[in-house]
């Protein structure tokens, strides 16, 4: 979550007049994250999140995201519930951007997760996959393997200024991943961005999942690979096998992996790491001037890739055969 578009008091008041959510008490921008402009809203009726969708989010995808959150919430998954206005619409316009209000989830993200947090996450991820099985809409993953080379083209000339040798390593990774990317794995709705700041806990109990704006239709095991990258490494590239084992075990307690998914885990983890390295690299080199935003370091995923290149099978990620 971040702020790219500033919202005036007058514009906000006009926008909120369409909603039956009480009178505004306070309004504050959220500086975390990288995709949209997000604000805390506190009203006489409760707490909400207001999101203005910025340019990387395609407007035609918004009905998928809004519909998915409503679908998952209706099936008992703890996620933001879109708030519809008095006319029954979940999407509006604010400051020239598409905008929506969703319910506020209680809990906090965990900055230094342990194995039990990872086990909880694995279980919640499998429950998300199960809850989304009958969701009727489809959205292609537009940040999967076919998108990585075009992304790299935007940053290739400057890559080595961020980290020496990064361009050559990325070219090698792309060649391997494009040749060996698995097809036809079990799939459906995935979150695709379940980093620690998108998962809330109250104590050690998982209380909610947020930020569904990369959700798409893809392989379930790829979503697991994203989580392994996001939760089980330190910024210096140190891998925590106990956390990975707990994450996978939590997932398989709800949905056991098929043999093809287990076999594909190393290549999926390598691809997931490259995907986040590339989007971070492009963002690192193109931060809008004056934006209230914290660009994330692509080198963290370059370090993770060192581990993934050496991984032989799922045992290296803590899953016993």
UniProtKB/Swiss-Prot annotation:
It catalyses: L-homoserine + ATP = O-phospho-L-homoserine + ADP + H(+). Gene3D superfamilies: 3.90.1200.10, Phosphorylase Kinase, domain 1 (3.30.200.20). InterPro entries: Aminoglycoside_PTrfase (IPR002575), Homoserine_kinase_II (IPR005280), Kinase-like_dom_sf (IPR011009), Pseudomonas-type_ThrB (IPR050249). Signal peptide: none annotated. Disulfide bonds: none annotated. One of its GO terms (biological process) is threonine biosynthetic process. It is an enzyme of class 2 (transferase). One of its GO terms (molecular function) is homoserine kinase activity. The keyword Chaperone does not apply. Pathway: Amino-acid biosynthesis; L-threonine biosynthesis; L-threonine from L-aspartate: step 4/5. Its EC number is 2.7.1.39. Keywords: Amino-acid biosynthesis, ATP-binding, Kinase, Nucleotide-binding, Threonine biosynthesis, Transferase. Pfam families: APH (PF01636). Belongs to the pseudomonas-type ThrB family. This is Homoserine kinase. It comes from Methylobacterium radiotolerans (strain ATCC 27329 / DSM 1819 / JCM 2831 / NBRC 15690 / NCIMB 10815 / 0-1). The lineage of its organism: Bacteria, Pseudomonadati, Pseudomonadota, Alphaproteobacteria, Hyphomicrobiales.
């Amino acid at each position: 979550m971040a702020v790219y578009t500033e919202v005036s008091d007058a514009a906000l008041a006009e926008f909120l007049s369409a909603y039956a959510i009480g009178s505004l008490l306070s309004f504050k921008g959220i500086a975390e994250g990288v995709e949209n402009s997000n604000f805390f809203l506190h009203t006489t009726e409760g707490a909400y999140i207001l999101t203005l969708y910025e340019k990387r989010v395609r407007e035609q995808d918004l009905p998928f995201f809004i519909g998915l959150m409503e679908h998952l919430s209706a099936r008992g998954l703890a996620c933001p519930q879109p708030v519809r206005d008095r006319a029954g619409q979940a999407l509006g316009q604010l400051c020239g951007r598409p905008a929506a209000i969703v319910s506020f989830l209680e809990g906090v993200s965990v900055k230094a997760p342990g194995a039990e947090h990872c086990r909880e996450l694995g279980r919640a991820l499998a429950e998300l996959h199960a809850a989304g099985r009958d969701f009727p809409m489809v959205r292609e993953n537009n940040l999967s393997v076919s998108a990585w080379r075009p992304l790299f083209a935007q940053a290739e000339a400057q890559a080595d200024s961020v980290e020496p040798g990064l361009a050559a390593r990325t070219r090698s990774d792309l060649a391997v991943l494009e040749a060996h990317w698995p097809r036809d794995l079990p799939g459906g709705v995935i979150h695709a961005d379940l980093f620690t700041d998108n998962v809330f806990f109250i104590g050690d109990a998982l209380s909610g999942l947020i930020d569904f704006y990369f959700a798409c239709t893809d392989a379930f095991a790829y979503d697991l690979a994203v989580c392994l990258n996001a939760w089980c490494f330190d910024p210096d590239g140190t891998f925590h096998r106990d956390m990975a084992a707990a994450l996978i075990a939590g997932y398989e307690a709800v949905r056991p992996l098929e043999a093809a998914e287990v076999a594909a885990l190393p290549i999926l983890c390598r691809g997931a790491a490259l995907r986040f390295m590339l989007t971070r690299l492009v963002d690192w080199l193109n931060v809008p001037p004056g934006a209230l935003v914290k660009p994330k370091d692509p080198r963290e995923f370059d370090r993770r890739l060192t581990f993934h290149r050496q991984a032989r099978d799922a045992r290296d990620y803590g899953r016993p055969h």
